[in-house]
Regions:
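RNase H-like nuclease fold core
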Residues: 1-45, 49, 56-57, 132, ...
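RNase H catalytic domain
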Residues: 33-37, 51-129, 134, 142-146
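Polybasic, low-complexity binding patches
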Residues: 148-150
Length: 150
């Protein structure tokens, strides 16, 4: 699940405007056109897949402004940057690292860890989208969604 935010005030409460959001299940079939290397659907492959989707979105949008990806997954952030060595999900990690490098060639890119379940509005929105995608339910429209709502 990816929620793209612009204009966050960096006070840690997830203020700012949603620019784009998307969610879905982890693709594990190598014959699927959307396959990027996940062999199983797990929390880690979901976090890496979401990271990859955010990076792909950055590449499609173009632009020169700095990008900061905020995630509650230290695993995904550290795998994407190559700080941690992949022991599992190697093909998926390699794909994410390739995307990270591509975006870094175009603009300044970093990631920040956001504590999960701590009231960060947009992290809670991402959790809502992920749960709804996993259960094949449509997400609540942003107009009617409230933080903490599953």
């Amino acid at each position: 699940t990816v929620v793209v935010i612009t204009g966050s005030n960096d006070l840690g409460r997830g203020n700012g405007e949603i620019h784009h959001e998307f969610s879905g299940k982890v693709v594990t079939s190598s014959v699927d056109e959307n396959y990027i290397g996940a062999e199983v659907g797990s929390n880690n492959t979901a976090e890496l897949t979401a990271f990859a989707e955010a990076l792909r979105w950055c590449l499609k949008q173009g632009g020169e402004e700095e990008i900061v990806i905020k995630t509650d997954s230290q695993y995904a952030g550290n795998q994407a940057t190559g700080k941690w060595k992949a022991k599992a999900n190697r093909e998926l990690v390699a794909h994410v690292q390739k995307l990270w490098k591509e975006v870094c060639e175009l603009r300044k890119l970093s990631w920040e860890h956001v504590k999960a379940h701590s009231g960060h509005r947009w992290n809670e929105r991402a959790d809502h989208l992920a749960i709804r995608a996993a259960t094949n339910d449509s997400p609540t429209s942003l107009s009617f969604w409230k933080p903490g709502q599953r």
